[in-house]
């Protein structure tokens, strides 16, 4: 029997989460604020998206943990990445977006960016004082 699973994350802000999802090539579904599951059941989410293989995924705010949780029906997960790897990629891009936004606010510029073989991203930043 299929049911919805919620997976805790450390993602605390909507804007960098949406930017991360978009940068990874995932389209946010602006009209739907729910995730469909087995036998047409659905659950409400704050951010909804469709992955390949008709996999439905959403992120829902959890007031207790002050973070978003991933919501999906794991029995219907047909995406090419395992759910753990998907969360890892989203978390990495979320951190990247957060760092870029904060450093630009503080007057830093990216001098160099390297995507390493191990999947990490190396940034070199500079700030010019007047």
Regions found by a protein language model. Give the residues of each.
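Interaction-mediating elements
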Residues: 1-130
